[in-house]
């Protein structure tokens, strides 16, 4: 039997899932906000990544992205962290051609599915990255360069001992604030009430942010946010859904 060819998509998956070690060979443990799941990368998803990465994919680099060059315009760039399978992200890109969208997802099946849907919808204002979002924010995105951040249904890490793994922490918000332009927004949504309260607390601590909620907590579900599979799951389980929308002063 001939050996299966290792494609670009396979190598990308291997790179993302490789553990990190110090120079003397000891495991370098990092507190991450995501779990590297082992879902199968389908042949279709693999082909979509291999065939369309040049059009949709960006790589981690040690200098800032030139968004005007990448997108061919100076429209606002909206960053979404953890787009899952990418359907809602592609829908937003399709519905808002006056905006550019940049999605980050560490799970290669989701990246492949997102690219496939983007090809189907023929969107031109979307790029995706398969890498740790904290490193992308730090290394690749210039200060005052983002029009907004979207974080929809992040991993809730529901056990108290794992709350430190939740991505929404004061230092994360501080990092995002540096990257946002004035009047840029932070839009979060979750179906875990405890996490919603934490999001509200962390965002409210920043004096540079204004809560757009009339009740100074959560906003009604906005029509412009597409219904995601996580939200549908939450409805089936009887969960509420909480949206937060803050703007940089």
Swiss-Prot record:
* Keyword annotations of the record: Methyltransferase, S-adenosyl-L-methionine, Transferase, tRNA processing
EC supergroup of this enzyme: transferase
Record-listed substrate binding positions: 159, 191, 228-231
Q: Known PROSITE patterns for this protein?
A: SAM_MT_TRMB
In the record, what terms sit under GO molecular function? tRNA (guanine(46)-N7)-methyltransferase activity
EC number(s) of the enzyme?
2.1.1.33
Q: Its annotated pathway?
A: tRNA modification; N(7)-methylguanine-tRNA biosynthesis
Query: Which residue positions does the secretion signal occupy?
Result: none
* Keyword Ribonucleoprotein on entry: no
Residues that hold S-adenosyl-L-methionine according to the record: 80, 105, 132, 155
Methyltransferase: is it a keyword of this entry? yes
The reaction(s) catalysed by this protein are: guanosine(46) in tRNA + S-adenosyl-L-methionine = N(7)-methylguanosine(46) in tRNA + S-adenosyl-L-homocysteine
Of which family is this protein a member?
Belongs to the class I-like SAM-binding methyltransferase superfamily. TrmB family.
HAMAP family associated with the record? tRNA_methyltr_TrmB
Name of the protein described by the UniProt record: tRNA (guanine-N(7)-)-methyltransferase
| Organism encoding this protein | Mannheimia succiniciproducens (strain KCTC 0769BP / MBEL55E)
């Amino acid at each position: 039997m001939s050996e299966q060819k290792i494609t670009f998509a396979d190598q990308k998956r291997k790179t993302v899932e490789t553990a990190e070690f110090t120079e003397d060979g000891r495991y370098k443990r990092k507190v991450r906000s995501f779990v590297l799941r082992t879902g199968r990368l389908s042949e279709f998803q693999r082909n979509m990544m291999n065939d369309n990465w040049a059009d949709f994919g960006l790589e981690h680099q040690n200098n800032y992205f030139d968004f005007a060059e990448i997108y061919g315009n100076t429209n606002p760039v909206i960053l979404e962290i953890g787009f899952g399978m990418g359907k809602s992200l592609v829908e937003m890109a399709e519905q808002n051609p006056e905006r550019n969208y940049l999605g980050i997802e560490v799970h290669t099946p989701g990246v492949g599915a997102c690219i496939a849907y983007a090809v189907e919808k023929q969107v031109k204002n979307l790029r995706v990255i398969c890498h740790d979002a904290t490193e992308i924010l730090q290394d690749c995105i210039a200060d005052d360069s983002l029009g907004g951040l979207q974080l929809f249904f992040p991993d809730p890490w529901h056990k108290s001992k794992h709350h430190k793994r939740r991505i929404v922490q004061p230092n994360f918000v501080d990092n995002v604030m540096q990257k946002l332009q004035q009047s840029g927004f932070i839009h979060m949504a979750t179906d875990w009430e405890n996490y919603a309260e934490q999001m509200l607390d962390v965002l409210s601590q920043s004096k540079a942010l204004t809560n757009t909620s009339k009740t100074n907590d959560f906003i009604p579900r906005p029509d412009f946010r597409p219904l995601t599979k996580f939200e549908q799951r939450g409805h089936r389980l009887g969960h509420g859904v909480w949206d937060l929308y803050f703007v940089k002063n």
